[in-house]
């Protein structure tokens, strides 16, 4: 509402979510016309994350907000960049790869062999971000 009051159009906005924020970003970006979407260390669903941490616990029954991003990403029509570190100790790397696989085109990825959950904003990552943003113009 605030953006509409300021007359800022969706197509001029890039949605960026990191970790838990990727669930929110995926939710917001569905069926919208944003300039782009960037997901850093995304998860497939909170159920999947819970199962990796507590495999014998009935996670599905305990979660109110399941953030099933793997089911919602197909509804994102904007260009998307997925970034994930292979040594992420919080959100398993396979989840980022799966989210990339499920995403619609145009889609881009930056997978780092050395980054953990909080990715290092080094020159290589910044160049990938610039490349993605430049592709939106």
PLM ranges: what are they?
Residues 2-54:
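Primarily recognizes the serine-hydrolase "nucleophile elbow" in alpha/beta-hydrolase
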Residues 10, 34, 77-78, 105:
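Active-site acidic short loop of glycosyltransferases
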Residues 35, 42-78:
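Mobile cap/lid helix-loop segments that gate and shape the active-site cleft of serine hydrolases
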Residues 69, 78, 92-101:
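Short alpha-helix in the alpha/beta-hydrolase fold that links the catalytic acid
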Residues 75-77, 82-88:
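Short beta-strand/loop motif that positions the catalytic acidic residue
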Residues 86-91, 116-119:
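Acidic catalytic loop of the alpha/beta-hydrolase fold
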Residues 97-118:
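Catalytic histidine neighborhood in serine/cysteine hydrolases
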Residues 120-134:
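Post-His helix in hydrolase/transferase enzymes
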């Amino acid at each position: 509402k605030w953006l509409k009051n300021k007359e800022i159009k969706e197509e001029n906005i890039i949605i960026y979510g990191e970790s838990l924020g990727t669930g929110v970003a995926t939710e917001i970006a569905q069926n919208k016309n944003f300039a782009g979407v960037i997901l850093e260390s995304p998860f497939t669903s909170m159920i999947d994350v819970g199962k990796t941490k507590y495999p014998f616990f009935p996670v599905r029954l305990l979660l109110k907000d399941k953030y099933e991003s793997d089911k919602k990403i197909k509804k994102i029509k904007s260009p998307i960049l997925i970034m994930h570190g292979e040594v992420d100790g919080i959100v398993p790397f396979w989840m980022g790869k799966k989210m990339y696989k499920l995403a619609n085109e145009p889609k881009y990825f930056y997978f780092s062999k050395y980054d953990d959950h909080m990715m290092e904003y080094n020159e290589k990552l910044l160049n990938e971000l610039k490349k993605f943003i430049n592709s939106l113009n």
